[in-house]
């Protein structure tokens, strides 16, 4: 796929996600081709159309800007707006966020125990799902209280702030005073994080199998540091993700990596390839192409 095709696909996915998958891929693609992948302008024009067509008092609560004339008069945009009616208390926030060009998203950690593969993905808050690149199974994110990786710590005793490898819920000794401190959060890997910013402290924690164990240690605990995991012949996955049970939505969940280490263009190309393979598998099972 060309770079132009990748950009088109990204804009289609963003437009569809703004309206929670209620705009078909075919319609979104046609609009993005017609208006140069301007998902922001088309999204706002759809919201404007909804407000104009709805006619309820509730529409007064929707702050819709007047779109460009060519979009305002476009029949395809008007048709999409009509298909999204009526405006309700339940979908008002969706339309307002689309007007503001917002897609609430979060960085989440995923882990496939079968492949011993760990990755991060930026996903929509409304549908936190990602596919393992190795086995292609879809997974829910690792529970927040079980995440692991580079953690952020704030010592309540000496007020020292530091970073180090850990799993949520497992204490590590403060580099300043030695007081056991629980991690505040796990930091996702990012391109914009300085790779040369290395800690001057060697990792050390109270886990029983830590390669640089701090005493007194806690029996039955396991160190999250990659060096300890490798030295002890343990898998990379500390806590696996639960398999995702599909609800039937077909909107791809890769929106924007936002600085995460994986490249968005490659991810979209992979997703497209996998979607094509899935369609072929369904056709083989059903004995012919789908309409």
UniProtKB/Swiss-Prot annotation:
Residues 102-150 are annotated as: Interaction with PABPC1. InterPro entries: SHFL. GO terms for cellular component: cytoplasm; cytosol; nucleoplasm; nucleus; P-body. The keyword Cytoplasm applies. It holds the Pfam family UPF0515. Its main location: cytoplasm. A motif (Nuclear export signal) lies at residues 261-269. Keywords: Acetylation, Antiviral defense, Cytoplasm, Nucleus, RNA-binding. GO terms for biological process: defense response to virus; innate immune response; negative regulation of translational frameshifting; negative regulation of viral genome replication; regulation of translational termination; response to interferon-beta; response to type I interferon; response to type II interferon. This is Shiftless antiviral inhibitor of ribosomal frameshifting protein.
């Amino acid at each position: 796929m060309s770079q132009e095709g990748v950009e088109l696909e990204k804009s289609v996915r963003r437009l569809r996600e703004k309206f929670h998958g209620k705009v078909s891929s075919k319609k979104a693609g046609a609009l993005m081709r017609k208006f140069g992948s301007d998902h922001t302008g088309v999204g706002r024009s759809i919201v404007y159309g909804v407000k104009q067509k709805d006619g309820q008092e509730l529409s007064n609560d929707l702050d819709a800007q007047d779109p460009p004339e060519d979009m305002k008069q476009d029949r395809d945009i008007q048709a999409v707006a009509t298909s999204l009616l009526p405006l309700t208390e339940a979908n008002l926030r969706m339309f307002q966020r689309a007007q503001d060009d917002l897609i609430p998203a979060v960085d989440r950690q995923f882990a496939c125990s079968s492949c011993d593969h760990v990755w991060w993905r930026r996903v929509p808050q409304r549908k936190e799902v990602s596919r393992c690149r190795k086995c292609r199974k879809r997974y829910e994110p690792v529970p927040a209280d079980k995440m692991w990786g580079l953690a952020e710590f704030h010592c309540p005793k000496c007020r020292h702030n530091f970073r180090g490898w850990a799993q949520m819920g497992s204490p590590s000794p403060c580099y300043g005073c030695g007081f056991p401190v629980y991690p505040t959060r796990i930091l996702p890997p990012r391109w914009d994080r300085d790779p040369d910013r290395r800690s001057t402290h060697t990792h050390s924690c109270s886990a029983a199998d830590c390669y640089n164990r701090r005493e007194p240690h806690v029996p039955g605990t396991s160190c999250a540091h990659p060096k300890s995991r490798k030295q002890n012949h343990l898998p990379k996955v500390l806590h696996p993700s639960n398999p995702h049970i599909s609800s039937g939505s077909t909107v791809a969940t890769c929106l924007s990596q936002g600085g995460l280490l994986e490249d968005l263009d490659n991810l979209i190309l992979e997703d497209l390839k996998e979607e094509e393979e899935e369609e072929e598998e369904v056709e083989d099972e059903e004995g012919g192409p789908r309409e």
